[in-house]
């Protein structure tokens, strides 16, 4: 059995060399402490938006490679594979193989394998000492099957919102190096303001799998007054900020994109079926100011590091995970903007609270068939 006390040997020196931020060093220290107890083999790092979880993962991988161990890093979507590889290479990790059909970086012998959960579901999973699961709250079946079958492997989960039902039945422990409030206070995340011009009436919308029915929610949000309010509020208060908009479903998000275009605002639409080339083009146009409002449903809730200073939330939800993920897309500090402006047309901030007030200290241990108190399962991206 691998000696977990020495798995990350040399991390203190690496932390100084790479100038990790204090909360990143603390994340590695807490992880070492948890795994060092002996009984914990599956540990989640609760890593708020902006904590730098990819860099933290890089240091974990470096420590594992120093001991001659193989690592699998799983991403929640194929679209995130290349940026993950680039991030690892930027920190000096070169022995990387990508598990994806016809990918130029395919190398089964590489010590570090990067794969999407969709690919893992169709492939034989290679041997590894450590599996790092990004966005582990999404609870991919292939990962959880591996967790129950591979008792010789250590699993490290990464998530800003590890609050999904039943996670505590699979994972042994969760460590929390910092909170969103901590990162805002220390200047690593942006201050934010919330303006809620509309509170949609959701009383007649049924609940499915712990969240509002998507189609019924879209009907509520497609009302003429609400549709007009979204555009008018941004024109009055949005200050022409680079903006991400979240719609209730694809049709609703497309309608809002068209409404912004009619108002003379450069807009783009992106969903799970937008190919990687078009998505890269949208990102480039967004970064250089050619697109002011990028509309989606859930595609842009994770793995997006765009220079956003306004969030339009037009998608009511009961999910604190989804709520925090959406607002988190705009909390990174951007040059030239003082804060994040949240235009909440969904009533989510009033219903669920401000993201600085939402926090969990333990993993949920709700048994199958029982109702979790306040959380629905977030959907995996379609790829």
List PLM regions with ranges:
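Conserved pre-motif I regulatory segment
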Residues: 2-46
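Walker A/P-loop
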Residues: 37-61, 246, 270, 295
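Conserved strand-helix element at the start of the C-terminal RecA-like helicase core
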Residues: 45, 54, 69-81, 216-263, ...
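Conserved interdomain linker/interface between the two RecA-like ATPase lobes of SF2 helicase motors
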Residues: 174-249, 368
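Conserved RecA-like P-loop NTPase helicase motor core
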Residues: 116-123, 139, 272-364
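Conserved helicase ATPase core of P-loop NTP-dependent helicases/translocases
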Residues: 82, 96-109, 252-302
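Post-DEXD/H (motif II) to motif III coupling segment of the RecA-like Helicase ATP-binding lobe
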Residues: 135-195
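A conserved SF2-helicase RecA2
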Residues: 175-195, 204, 208, 334-383
